[in-house]
Amino acid sequence: MPLMPKRVKHRKMHRGSRSGNATSGTYVAFGDFGLQVLDRGWITNNQIEACRIAINRYLKRKGKVFIRIFPQKSFTSRPPDTRMGKGKGAVEGWVAVVRPGNILFEVGGVTESQAREALRLASNKLGVSTRFVYRQGVQH
């Protein structure tokens, strides 16, 4: 089951602005280590799921993984070989809008080296640059 909202008020959305930095969700709150975004962009539900699988596969169900983003924006596309006009295309998928500073994933209950490697594997699945961060007060 892909990550997507159960129901939305308006199915088709504008692309919106991606300018500015993140104002919330910028610190590690649940786990001990996190993956922070340095770029701005869209992360699809499939990318989030691929990251989750990569982290869980490396950690072998030890520790706990927290997903801090949710794809709540729909994006549409037109079929190929279609002329302009005739309305907006069908919903193609769902994305999470991320800005510099957002925490994407958090890991707890594992060592720093395990968390670093798991989050490195996850960052390879993303189209944005990221960095490894610690929760405030964690010894490193």
From Swiss-Prot:
Residues 1-21 are annotated as: Disordered. Gene3D superfamilies: Ribosomal protein L10e/L16. Residues 1-17 have a biased composition (Basic residues). One of its GO terms (biological process) is translation. GO terms for cellular component: cytosolic large ribosomal subunit. The keyword rRNA-binding applies. InterPro entries: Ribosomal_uL16, Ribosomal_uL16_bact-type, Ribosomal_uL16_CS, Ribosomal_uL16_dom, Ribosomal_uL16_sf. CDD domains: Ribosomal_L16_L10e (cd01433). Keywords: Ribonucleoprotein, Ribosomal protein, RNA-binding, rRNA-binding, tRNA-binding. It comes from the Bacteria. SUPFAM superfamilies: Ribosomal protein L16p/L10e (SSF54686). Part of the 50S ribosomal subunit. Belongs to the universal ribosomal protein uL16 family. This is Large ribosomal subunit protein uL16. The gene is rplP.
